[in-house]
Each structure stands twice: as C-alpha cells, then as structure tokens.
C-alpha cells in the first residue's frame, strides 16, 4: 500500500461549495485516495509514508478545465503547439473535459466518422494520460445521421460526453433535441455552444436554442469568444437549472455579470470554469487560475468559492470522483501559496487580490507530478517532500 501524508497545512479549501473550508491541517492519502483529514494525530501512524511538509501554505483540489478542444496526444493543431496539457498541469489542472475535437485535421463530418473519432480519442486518452493529467477525451460532435444505436455503441466503448452542440451539422433544436434525449437516456453528459459563431461552419446559439435543447452544460455562457446578451443570460439563469460555464477565452464583462447575478440568486453552485482552448484565442496554461483570480478580485466572490467553481462544482456536473477534498475521493491536490512580492499573506488572499498564486506541488492520485511549477510565480512558502 502506498501512503502519503501532507502535514503543516495552513488552510484546506475543500472544493465543496456547501462547506468550502475544512478545519484541519493534515491529509492522509492511501493508494491514490484521500483516506483521512484531521490534525497532527494522523502522523502517529505515518510508518514509511511519504511526508510532504506544506510549510503553512494552502491545499486545494486539483483544478478541472471543463472546456478543452483536444485532438489527440499533447498536441494542438489549431496553434501548432506541443505539450499544452503538460503546461496546464503546471497551472494546477489535473483533469480536462473535452468539448469536442473540431480542430482534428480532416475531421470527419458524417455519422460513422464522428462516432469513430470519438471512440478513438476517448480510448487513446484513457490509455495514455499526457503528463498524468486525467483527460476525458472523445466528446462526440453531433452530425446528421447519428442514431440511438450509435449512442449505445459509443457508451459501450467508453464515450460519455457530447461535445458542444452546434459545432457539427446538427445546429437547430429541432434536430438536436432528439439526439440529446438519446444521449441522456444512455448516460451521456451534454454540452451546448452558446453565443456567436466561433469557427467556420459552427452556428450562433441563443438562449431559446439552449432552453429547447436541454443540455447539461451551457458552454462558455460568457462567449466563445462572442457572448450572448445579459437578457439572454438572465433567461438561461432564470428558466433552467443547467450548469453555466465561464471560460477564460471569452467575454470578461459577461463573466462578471454571470458571477454577480448568480451570487444574488444563490446559484453559484451552477458556475463552472473552463478555458475554451486550444482555440483562436490561443492556449492559456494558467487559464483556470486566471478565472479564479478574475471572479474573486473583480466580481466580489470569495476566493474559496472561486476555487469550488474550478473543482467541486465541475465534478458534481460530470459525476467524477475528484475535485473535492474528502475521504474516498481521488487524491488530486495542489499545494499553493501567495507568490513572492504579492500584497497578500496566503493563496486565497492572493486570488482575492488578483494575483496568480504560486504552486509548489501538484499531486495526481497521491503521486507528486509537479514539485515546482514552471508557469506560476514562485510560492512564498514552498512545500517540501521530506
């Protein structure tokens, strides 16, 4: 049995928006899962465990990027960039959710081809995780000709996500709604493009389209990159219970509006964070951290709640056993602190001030995969593996 203990933690941010902060300073990990959370008494049974001294800094769940356009491996054809997933890991991202693979060279746009591509990419990312990141690839793009039997086959082969509705030849609610119903019947999670056209061949999607189609996730409610109006945002927020995704590669003004209005309505649990990259905007390795900083510093949202938007809110939508610090959850964790030179005293203070926190350690399934981030500024107090 492998065992890791993180001790001397200054603050634990749980990722659970109902209880964002845990009163504890020690986390025990066994065989890749969180086994216990408590105080120094947990060190009594340390045995030959690997000990990580957090040096008084903050531990959060590993971050989720709920909007990634992966195309196979750790390569982004749209921007001709290698190792973007590895770079995101150094920004604290331990799980990625595909929103479809529209940049795949020669992407097939028929039913057989889109199904085959989804199955291939899903299996490939589960077979080989780039840099250890948990990539849920192979989100199927809806194309004309798909049948209910296709969804049954895809689910059997491991595909469980429908990429942004509107990226393929299925564009209007009349065509999309029956496929979404099949997808839900067979256990898929469904995303839907929202806002202006993003790539040639995609479509503009309104609040009315979203309401009629009934996805699980309103993809980039703040635009990808062109946003719907605040009136359309209000309709989605008031007339549905769908998850609302704020992305880094979108409209910051609408992101602020969504966060503030969700807070007013007591609906911050519906807000999740993605990057919407690779895209024409580019690649932003620290995009999820930037979302957290933006929403906390500019929209008056508590930084601990902003962390939940990047972690537990997302895993609740997608049904994943990570993103929350609790016994039995996968031990995907970040140790972070205020960066050198910040006005803040700790990581949450830095996020509230708009400063990117410094990451000193990232763990996936309890194994340290980053021991000093190459992309964040240096942490004032760096964790050490003893």
From Swiss-Prot:
The residues forming a coiled coil are none
Question: Which Pfam families would you find in this protein's record?
Answer: Amidohydro_1 (PF01979)
Query: Biological process GO terms, please?
Result: nicotinate catabolic process
For molecular function, the Gene Ontology terms on record are: enamidase activity; metal ion binding
Q: Name one GO cellular component term.
A: cytosol
What EC designation does it have?
3.5.2.18
Q: Which InterPro entries match?
A: Amidohydro-rel (IPR006680), Metal-dep_hydrolase_composite (IPR011059), Metal_Hydrolase (IPR032466), Metallo-dep_Hydrolases_sf (IPR050378)
Could you tell me what reaction this enzyme catalyses? 1,4,5,6-tetrahydro-6-oxonicotinate + 2 H2O = 2-formylglutarate + NH4(+)
Q: Which SUPFAM superfamilies is this protein grouped with? A: Composite domain of metallo-dependent hydrolases (SSF51338), Metallo-dependent hydrolases (SSF51556)
Keyword entries, A-Z: Hydrolase, Iron, Metal-binding, Zinc
Which residues bind Zn(2+) per the record? 67, 69, 164, 276
The positions annotated for binding Fe cation are 164, 193, 220
Cofactor(s) essential for the protein: Fe cation; Zn(2+)
Q: Provide the leader sequence positions.
A: none
Q: How is the cofactor bound?
A: Binds 1 Fe cation per subunit.
Give the metabolic or biological pathway.
Cofactor degradation; nicotinate degradation; propanoate and pyruvate from 6-hydroxynicotinate: step 2/8
Q: What does this protein do?
A: Decyclization of 6-oxo-1,4,5,6-tetrahydronicotinate to form 2-(enamine)glutarate, followed by hydrolysis to form (S)-2-formylglutarate.
Q: Do you know which PANTHER family this protein is assigned to?
A: COLLAPSIN RESPONSE MEDIATOR PROTEIN, HYDRANTOINASE/DIHYDROPYRIMIDINASE FAMILY MEMBER
Record's family?
Belongs to the metallo-dependent hydrolases superfamily. Adenine deaminase family.
- Subunit notes for this chain? Homotetramer. Dimer of dimers.
Question: Which protein are we looking at?
Answer: Enamidase
Q: What organism, scientifically named, is this protein from?
A: Eubacterium barkeri (Clostridium barkeri)
Q: What is the lineage of its organism?
A: Bacteria, Bacillati, Bacillota, Clostridia, Eubacteriales
């Amino acid at each position: 049995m492998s065992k890791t203990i993180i001790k001397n933690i200054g603050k634990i941010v749980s990722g659970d928006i109902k209880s964002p902060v845990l009163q504890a300073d020690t986390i025990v990990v066994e065989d890749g899962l969180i086994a216990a959370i408590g105080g120094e008494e947990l060190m009594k049974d340390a045995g030959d465990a690997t000990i990580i001294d957090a040096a008084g800094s903050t531990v959060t769940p590993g971050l989720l990027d709920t909007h990634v356009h992966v195309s196979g491996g750790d390569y982004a054809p749209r921007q001709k960039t290698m190792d973007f997933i590895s770079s995101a890991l150094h920004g604290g991202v331990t799980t990625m959710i595909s929103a479809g693979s529209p940049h795949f060279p020669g992407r097939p746009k028929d039913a057989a081809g889109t199904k085959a591509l989804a199955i291939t990419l899903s299996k490939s990312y589960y077979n080989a995780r780039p840099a250890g990141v948990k990539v849920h690839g192979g989100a199927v793009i809806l194309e004309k000709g798909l049948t209910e039997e296709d969804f049954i086959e895809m689910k059997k082969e491991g595909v469980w996500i429908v990429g942004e509705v509107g990226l393929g030849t299925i564009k209007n609610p009349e065509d999309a709604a029956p496929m979404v119903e099949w997808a839900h019947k067979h256990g898929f999670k469904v995303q839907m493009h929202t806002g202006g056209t993003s790539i040639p061949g995609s479509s503009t999607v309104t609040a009315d389209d979203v309401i009629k189609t009934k996805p699980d996730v309103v993809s980039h409610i703040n635009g990808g990159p062109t946003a719907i109006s605040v009136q359309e945002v209000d309709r989605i927020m008031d007339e549905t219970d769908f998850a609302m995704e704020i992305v880094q590669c979108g409209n910051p003004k609408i992101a602020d509006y969504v966060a503030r209005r969700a807070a007013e309505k007591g609906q911050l649990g519906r807000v999740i964070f993605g990057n919407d990259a690779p895209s024409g905007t580019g690649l932003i390795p620290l995009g999820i951290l930037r979302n957290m900083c933006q929403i906390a510093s500019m929209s008056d949202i508590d930084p601990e709640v902003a962390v939940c938007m990047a972690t537990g809110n997302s895993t609740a939508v997608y049904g994943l056993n990570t993103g929350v610090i609790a016994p039995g959850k996968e031990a995907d964790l970040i140790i972070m602190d205020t960066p050198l030179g910040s006005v803040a005293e700790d990581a949450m203070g830095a996020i509230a001030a708009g400063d990117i926190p410094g990451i000193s350690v990232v763990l996936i399934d309890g194994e340290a995969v980053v021991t000093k981030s190459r992309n964040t500024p240096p942490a004032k107090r760096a964790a050490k593996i003893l």
